[in-house]
Amino acid sequence: MRQQHEITTSGPLLGSDGNLLEPGWARSLLPVYRRADIKAGAMRVKEWDYYLITDGHIGLALTIADNGYMGLDSVSFLDFDGKWEKTTSRMRTLPLGRTQLPESSAEGASEISKGGYALTFYHEDGARMLSFHMDKFLGKEPIEGIVKLTDEPDESMVIATPFDKPGHFYYNQKINCMRAEGWIELGSRRYELTKDKFFAVLDWGRGVWTYHNTWYWGSASGELDGVPFGWNIGYGFGDTSAATENVLFYDGKIHKLGEVKFEIPMDEDGFEDFMKPWVFTSDDNRFYMNFTPVLDRSAFMSAGVVLSDQHQVFGHFTGRITLDDGTVLPVRDFFGFAEKVENKW
C-alpha cells in the first residue's frame, strides 16, 4: 500500500501554467478553484453538480452540467422495488461556461431554466435546496419536486487529480450522508421524502478532461447501527499516484482507504454481466464487500465523435470495513451503487 498525500493548507488549485499546484486529497475544499486560472479552451472545461437522493426503495438524481461544447441537464427517477427507472436529459449546444456554475460547492446557486424544464440548486439557512420540474418526463407525465438537504458531515472527500496531458486536471468533492426531506410528484403520484429514511450524496466536479476516459465509481450513504455511515470509492482516470478518492464516512468524519478494486463478473461470452454479484476488495484490507445488484441504470449514446456508455448499478452491499483506529464493522444489506462509465467527450 502506497503513501497518499493529504492537502492540509488552503491555496490556489492551479498555477500560472494551468496545472495543479498540489495533487492529493483533502477533507474540505482547501484548494481554491478559479475558472479564470484554466489555460485550456472553453470547449474542454467540464463542470457539473450531481445529486442522488434515495432510501433504497426509490431514488432521485439531478444533474446540471456544462461540458464546454455541450450542456447536459437531467432528471432520473428510480423505483428499486419495481425495478424500473426513467432518465430524461436535455442537451444544450455550446454553453462554453455560460451556465456559470459556482466555483465552490459551499456557496452560490447552480441553475438552469429552458423550455419545459428548470433545475435550481441553492443554499438557504444552512441547508441545500434542490428544486426541479420537467415537462413530458415519463411519456406525457411531468415530474417536479423540492428537496431539502441537511446534516452535512464535518468532512468530505476532496481530490485534485492531474492527467498526463499538461493543463488537464479533475477537481472533485463528494459529500455523502446528507439527510433529505421533501416531495416528488410524478404525474398523479406523490412521494414524501422523510429525513429519517432518505440520504443524499453530492458529486461536485470541475476540470479539464482528456478525450477518452473510463471510470469506476461507487457510493453509499445511510446509517450503521444508528451512526451516519457511507463510502466513496473509485478509480480509472488521471494520475492517482498522489492519492485515491477512496474513503469511509463515519459519524461525520473521513477514514482514508487505499486502492479499491471493482471485480465485475463476466458472462460466458467474455462480456461484463453487470447484474451478477460483484466483489470489492482493497489493498489495505479495510474494505471488503459482496454486491448484489437490483437495478442497472444503463445508457448508451454515440453521436459523431461523442460517446457515452454507462452502467450505474444499484443494489445491496454485505461485507466489512475497518476504521482508522482499527475498529472492524460488519456491513449487511447496505444500499448503494457502483458504476462503470466510458466517455469520449
Short names for language-model regions:
Residues 1-345:
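Structured soluble/peripheral alpha/beta segments that form catalytic or ligand/cofactor-binding pockets
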